[in-house]
Every structure is written in structure tokens, then in C-alpha cells.
Amino acid sequence: MKFGHNAIRVKDIDVMLRYYVNGFGFEEAFRIFNDDSSLRIVYVHISNGQYLELCLGGGDRPKFDDAASLGHRHMAFIVDDLVKTKSELESRGIVFDSDIMNSRDHNLAAYLFDPEGNKIELVQVGSGSPHAKFESH
């Protein structure tokens, strides 16, 4: 079994597509339509069979400000070089909510929010992290 997609409900598909395609460099893969031919879902290809599913029909959402709330907290993307990736994304207009930091799991991390408030983490896996140790066993 492997991870397939993360689905997020969106209000403005055009803004979100520009953000993830133009900003992050991901590729729009395909679209799914309703019976009345209206757009329902846009799949954005991330890597190796992994997608971000942008589902139309989002309303207002509460601001993410309660780390103790149950449910989805953030989505994370693994990068090889966080300093380089952060710089490239910033050159494309992506704004970060944090500087690069050392996380408790011995990785480098930086956080940002997409235009509709979904929290994103970029992670550079450290050689001494539990992630690296687990993957190497």
C-alpha cells in the first residue's frame, strides 16, 4: 500500500491551481466533472502516483489557530535541499510563515499557508532523524 492523495476542499480553483502549479511547480494531471458537466475535482500530480485533490465547493473555514483541535493539521512535502527549495519558491512569490528550523524529529522544516489557509510543511529529512532511521531498516 502507498499514499495516493490528499483531498482539500477549495473555494477558488483558479487561485489554488496557480499556487500549486505555478508556485510549487506541480502539474495539473486531470479533471473530474459532475453529471451536469460542471467541474468537480482537479488532480494535481506531486510525485510517483501521489496527488493533491482539489475539490470544488469550499465555504468559509475556521482559521488554523488551535493546535489541540482534532483533525487535519497540515500536509508535508519532503525536499532534498530545504534552503534551495525555499529560495526557489520565494522567487515565485510563495510566502513562508516561518524561517527554516530544526524540528524535534531532527529534520529541517519550514511552514507556510496556501491561499485558502491550508497549512503546509516542507521537510528536509536529517540523517539522524527517526524518519531516516526507519527508512534505512
Where are these regions (language model features)?
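Short, charged/polar surface micro-motifs in flexible loops or helix N-caps
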Residues: 47-51, 59-60, 82-84
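Exposed loop/turn and edge beta-strand positions of beta-sandwich/beta-sheet ligand-binding modules
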Residues: 38, 71, 106
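Vicinal oxygen chelate
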Residues: 86-137
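A short, acidic/glycine-rich surface segment
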Residues: 29-30, 39, 59-65, 98, ...
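Mid-chain, well-packed structural core segment of small domains
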Residues: 75-78, 82-89
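Core segments of cupin and vicinal oxygen chelate
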Residues: 8-51
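N-terminal beta-strand motif that seeds the catalytic metal site of vicinal oxygen chelate
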Residues: 1-17, 72-77, 126-137
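Short hydrophobic/aromatic beta-strand element in the GNAT-like acyltransferase core
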Residues: 41, 76, 109-110
